[in-house]
Design a protein with these regions (language model features):
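Glycine-rich phosphate-binding loops of nucleotide-dependent enzymes
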Residues: 1-256
Length: 256
């Protein structure tokens, strides 16, 4: 069953068409990729899925229901979480505190409970802390839990952003260039981590990534867009042998 489906999705900014008729499907517990050259519209697609942008036409279906028109926080509550190409951590907060912020969108205690039911609020905070520690253990970040986020290595910051996304209990995890800035060893570890996340948390993953070795090695299905338009969809082998993809994207690697 498809957990996410984009049906002929188009996004226009005035007279500019950034995304034009994209169709995409992600099955439950599947790892998929969306690829294309810089400016192809990949992040715009992510922004439409997460409610940062509203679609001009078409539909975004999550868990069998349209989420078009929903606000970003509503989409998080429904079970979609994302990371960003440019890391967006709370740099002066600790590693543990960063993950705990992800749980706060799911907590039930509001201002009334903070004032009149302080014990319940503190109990919920303690539960969030323990769950955050579990995520840090899972990602191998427990040893740096008390450090400020800005003081941990870049690769760890990437993992921390994934950890914060996991704290929202997603059914679909969107990763926007998760390997950007990582060295070859960190990229290998990232591949294993993404697979482990999928298997442990029983979620689907859709990633945008320029590292083709990583994409081809981890993705079960790949969608390719060029100048906002879809040009191919299939397995890694099918994409690698697709003439349109080679001409528009993969074939450029030798020149770059």
């Amino acid at each position: 069953m498809a957990i996410l489906e984009l049906k002929d999705v188009t996004k226009k900014f005035g007279g500019l068409t950034a995304v034009d008729g994209v169709n995409l499907k992600v099955e439950e517990n599947q790892i998929c990729a969306l690829i294309g050259s810089n400016g192809a519209g990949k992040t715009t697609v992510f922004n439409m899925i997460t409610g940062a942008y509203q679609v001009t036409s078409g539909d975004v279906i999550f868990n069998g229901k349209s989420i078009c028109g929903k606000k970003p926080h509503q989409i998080v509550e429904k079970g979609i979480a994302r990371t960003f190409q440019n890391i967006r951590l709370f740099k002066s907060a600790t590693v543990l505190e960063n993950v705990m912020t992800g749980f706060h969108c799911k907590t039930k205690t509001g201002m009334f409970n903070v004032i009149f039911n302080y014990r319940k609020c503190m109990q919920e905070e303690a539960e969030c802390r323990e769950k955050a520690l579990e995520i840090l253990r899972f990602l191998g970040l427990e040893d740096v839990k008390d450090l400020e986020a800005r003081n941990i290595p870049y690769g760890h910051q990437r993992l921390l952003e994934i950890g914060r996304a996991l704290a929202t209990s997603p059914k679909l995890l969107l990763l926007d260039e998760p390997a950007a800035g990582m060295n070859s060893q960190e990229k290998k570890e990232l591949v294993n981590t993404i697979r482990k996340i999928r298997d442990t948390y029983h979620l689907a993953v859709l990633l945008v990534e320029h590292d083709m070795e990583l994409v081809m090695g981890i993705s079960e299905n790949i969608t390719v867009i060029n100048f906002g338009r879809p040009i191919a969809c299939g397995t890694a082998e099918e994409i690698q042998n697709n003439n349109d993809v080679i001409e528009a994207y993969l074939g450029r690697s030798d020149d770059e």
